[in-house]
Amino acid sequence: MAAFLKMSVSVNFFRPFTRFLVPFTLHRKRNNLTILQRYMSSKIPAVTYPKNESTPPSEELELDKWKTTMKSSVQEECVSTISSSKDEDPLAATREFIEMWRLLGREVPEHITEEELKTLMECVSNTAKKKYLKYLYTKEKVKKARQIKKEMKAAAREEAKNIKLLETTEEDKQKNFLFLRLWDRNMDIAMGWKGAQAMQFGQPLVFDMAYENYMKRKELQNTVSQLLESEGWNRRNVDPFHIYFCNLKIDGALHRELVKRYQEKWDKLLLTSTEKSHVDLFPKDSIIYLTADSPNVMTTFRHDKVYVIGSFVDKSMQPGTSLAKAKRLNLATECLPLDKYLQWEIGNKNLTLDQMIRILLCLKNNGNWQEALQFVPKRKHTGFLEISQHSQEFINRLKKAKT
């Protein structure tokens, strides 16, 4: 018992001095400790063996780096082949460039036309080419989706037609019909006669096509869409204009887009398209250039004048372009009286080409501004201003004088 007490006393006596017996301890997970921290450590002293550095680290296969290296090498090879064959045949070099990008997994369309190839060749940088190819790829996907949807609808209609039992024949349907049916062919013939009469005796209306250098490709396509709508509204009107497409460059951007949209109907259109300017076709004193920037407000529609509309969709905000051109040619300019009749809210006073021709057709037929300005988009104004009694009397006098 006494020996045990002596042993416990000796252990208790040396316990505070254990940290001084082995001043430096080696811990694998605490190699970054300072000497003082190791000296003051209260853990039990321990000696560990150093890490065996003779074993080599596991080699990792970096697939991403390998892929990027291979892609860069293929891209360099693509650029070198294009630069070498550029002098020989640019079209073949562009096709090879597209094929290389397709092999690289880029977004490239499956089919590309000669016109799109020429547009791609006109791109200055590789970034512009990449953006244009991505646009064509997206456009092709949308077209395929629409085609699939169209085929599904056609199949559903055919199935419904086969299921449905027809109770009466086509002859019975015509007998039971109250009015005589007007076929599409008869309507086309009637509108064709009106168009032919307008080309001989109708009032000219000019669309100035001299703005294709001011527009980007998207704006140019939007312009052509508005021209198609304008021609359609004019063709269906009771008293159509004789439409002139002036300053239309043959094989220019606008001409190519118009031929692409109309296809074989382009040569059958009852309108006049020419490379000449409207100044060469009509006397200057009979021309009025309609532009929203003009300080002169249009009061009445003049049947003895030739109105000119600029075929210009301006998304990049270039105000005063058409006004400056009219001033250079010493032409009279006018703008629509939108502030006089409408409570204008927001936005500029530039209207689309189809809205302009519908307003002019309405003014040509009845001269009523309130009816004509209904074609102005409702989002731009809050309604019509109240017409004073003096203005109403003036309108009534004009109507009496006309009758």
Curated annotation (Swiss-Prot):
- Molecular functions (GO terms): identical protein binding; RNA binding; tRNA (adenine(9)-N1)-methyltransferase activity; tRNA (guanosine(9)-N1)-methyltransferase activity; tRNA binding
List-wise, which residues carry Phosphoserine?
Answer: 84
Instruction: Give me the Gene Ontology terms describing cellular component.
Output: mitochondrial matrix; mitochondrial nucleoid; mitochondrial ribonuclease P complex; mitochondrion; nucleoplasm; nucleus; tRNA methyltransferase complex
Keywords attached to this entry: Coiled coil, Disease variant, Methyltransferase, Mitochondrion, Mitochondrion nucleoid, Phosphoprotein, Primary mitochondrial disease, S-adenosyl-L-methionine, Transferase, Transit peptide, tRNA processing
GO BP annotations of the record are: mitochondrial RNA 5'-end processing; mitochondrial tRNA 3'-end processing; mitochondrial tRNA 5'-end processing; mitochondrial tRNA methylation; mitochondrial tRNA processing; mRNA processing; positive regulation of mitochondrial translation
Q: Which disease is it linked to?
A: Combined oxidative phosphorylation deficiency 30: An autosomal recessive, severe mitochondrial disease characterized by lactic acidosis, hypotonia, feeding difficulties, deafness, and respiratory failure with fatal issue. Patient skeletal muscle cells show decreased activities of mitochondrial complexes I, III and IV.
As for subcellular location, the record says: Mitochondrion matrix, Mitochondrion nucleoid
SS bond partners: none
- Tell me what reaction this enzyme catalyses: adenosine(9) in tRNA + S-adenosyl-L-methionine = N(1)-methyladenosine(9) in tRNA + S-adenosyl-L-homocysteine + H(+); guanosine(9) in tRNA + S-adenosyl-L-methionine = N(1)-methylguanosine(9) in tRNA + S-adenosyl-L-homocysteine + H(+); an adenosine in mRNA + S-adenosyl-L-methionine = an N(1)-methyladenosine in mRNA + S-adenosyl-L-homocysteine + H(+)
The top EC class, named as a word, is: transferase
Q: Supply the name of the protein.
A: tRNA methyltransferase 10 homolog C
| UniProt source species | Homo sapiens (Human)
- Subunit text: Component of mitochondrial ribonuclease P, a complex composed of TRMT10C/MRPP1, HSD17B10/MRPP2 and PRORP/MRPP3. Interacts with HSD17B10/MRPP2; forming the MRPP1-MRPP2 subcomplex of the mitochondrial ribonuclease P complex. Interacts with GRSF1.
Q: Which domain of life is it from?
A: Eukaryota
Q: What is the effect of changing residue 181 to L?
A: In COXPD30; decreased protein abundance; impaired mitochondrial tRNA processing; has no effect on steady-state mitochondrial-mRNA and mitochondrial-tRNA levels but indirectly impairs mitochondrial translation
The effect annotated for residue 272 to A is: In COXPD30; decreased protein abundance; impaired mitochondrial tRNA processing; has no effect on steady-state mitochondrial-mRNA and mitochondrial-tRNA levels but indirectly impairs mitochondrial translation
Membership in a protein family: Belongs to the class IV-like SAM-binding methyltransferase superfamily. TRM10 family.
Q: Which residues form the SAM-dependent MTase TRM10-type domain?
A: 191-383
Q: Where is the transit peptide?
A: 1-39
Query: Coiled-coil ranges per the record?
Result: 138-169
